[in-house]
Amino acid sequence: MHEVTVVGAGLVGCLAALAFADRGHKVALYDARPDLRSEAELKNASLRSINLAVSARGIEALRSVDTKMAERVLADIIPMYGRMIHDLQGGQHAQAYGLWGECINSIDRAQLNRTMLDVIEDNANITFFPEHKLTNISLSRKDKKYQRPTSTFETKEGEERVVESDYIIGADGAFSKTRDRLQRYVRMNYAQQYIDCVYLELKIPKADGPDPFSISPNHLHIWPRHKYMLIALANGDGSFTSTLFAPPALMEQVCESQNTFISFFKEQFPDAYELMGESQILESYENNPRSPLVSLKCSPYNHKGECLLVGDAAHCMVPFYGQGMNAGFEDIRVLMEILDEKKWNVEEAFNTYTERRHKDLVAIVDLAMRNYVEMSHSVVSLPYLIRKKVDGVLGRVFSSAWVPLYSMVSFRADIPYSKALSRSARQDRIIGNIVNWTSFAGLVGMGALFYYKGRHLFGRLFE
C-alpha cells in the first residue's frame, strides 16, 4: 500500500484520489480553498454557474474508476446533440455534432465537484484537508529529516504542516504551485499564452409555464459574430449559463457603461436580449468579472517516481473544444492503465506517462485554440459548411474508415488526440481535393453550356 498526496480537490484531483484509493492506497487530498460544500461556498456558487461539456473521454474515465460513482455524478447531465446557431435576425439553425445521433453533455461544474467530494467522504482510504495551501515540495531526499517526498502546507490558522508520502500528484490547476516547485528539480519546457479574448458570464433565466426551457436544452447555443460570440448551455432547472467571449479592447468598450452594454446586446444579440431580460443582463454586468483565458503546455510532467502533474497543472487549454475536464479525467485513466501495465513500478510508470501522454495533450491544447475561430466565425461561412457537408457524407458512406475530427475527439475515447489530429489532416486534404475538383468540374460544365448556347444564339443571328 502506498501513501499518496494529491494537491488540488478540483475535478481531476478528486478523480485521482478516488482512482488511487480504489487500488487500495492511502490518499491525503489537500485543497487551498474552503470545502465547496460549506454554506458560504454554496452561497458564492449560486452567484456564478459554470457549465462544462462532458463527453466520451470523461465518461469513460469516470467509469474506469468506479461505475457506481460515475452513475451518481452523471445523474443530472443534459444531452446536447449539436450546435444551434443564432443569426442577427433571431433565426436559429441546427448543426448536428455526430453522424449517428451522438451527443456531448452539459453539466454544472460546482455540483459535479460537490458530488465527487461526497463520494470521497464515503471512502475510507481518502482523507480530505480543505484550506491547506501548498507552499513547498521537497523531492529526492533534499530534506534530510525525511526519507520520502514531502509537501508543506499552510493551514487557514497560519500554521505549517509538513506531510511525507510515497509520491505527490499535482492537480492544482493552471497556476499550479506544484508545477512551480517541480521546476526546481527538472528541466521543464514551459509555455503559457493569454489569448486575445476575455469572457463575461451571464444567465438566461428559466421560463414561466410548464416548460422551463425558453430555448432547446439539447443544443449548445452559439451567437457567432466573427470577432466575438455568445454561447449558452442548459441547466437542469431550466435556466441557461451563458458566456460572452470578446477581445479585451472590445469588451472594455462595450462595458464602458450600462447603456453601452445594453445597446450592444440589443444590436448584436436581439433574441438573447429578450431571453435574458435587461435586469438580468445588468446584474451580470455589475457582479461578474471580465476574466482572461490562458493556455499552457509543459514537459516533462514528472520527477522520477516522486511527483507527477495532471489536469490543468500540466495542460491548461481554452474552453472552445469542451475538452479541458475530459482530457484531465482521461489523464487519470491513462495513468492508472500505465501503472497497472508497469506493475506499479511508479518511477517507470511516471516516466512512461510523460513520454506517452505529451503528444496527445499538445494536440488537444492546439485544437482547442483553433476551435475558437470555428465557433466564432467559420460556423456561418459557406466554405466551412460545404466542407462539413462533404465530411459528413464521407463519414456515412465509409463509416469504418472515415471519422470526422469532432467525432474522433468527442465520441471516440479509443482514438488518442494526436492520432485524431493527424488522421484529420489527411482527411482534410482529401476533402480539399474533392471540393476543388468539384468546383473545377462545375466551371467546365458551365463553360461548355455557355459555349453551346452561344454558338446556337450566334448561329440563329446570322441565318
Swiss-Prot record:
The enzyme's E.C. designation: 1.14.13.9
Signal peptide as annotated in the record: none
UniProt-annotated location(s): Mitochondrion outer membrane
Alphabetically ordered keywords of this record: FAD, Flavoprotein, Membrane, Mitochondrion, Mitochondrion outer membrane, Monooxygenase, NADP, Oxidoreductase, Pyridine nucleotide biosynthesis
GO cellular component: mitochondrial outer membrane
Pathway(s) per entry: Cofactor biosynthesis; NAD(+) biosynthesis; quinolinate from L-kynurenine: step 1/3
Top EC group: oxidoreductase
Record protein name field: Kynurenine 3-monooxygenase
Species name: Yarrowia lipolytica (strain CLIB 122 / E 150) (Yeast)
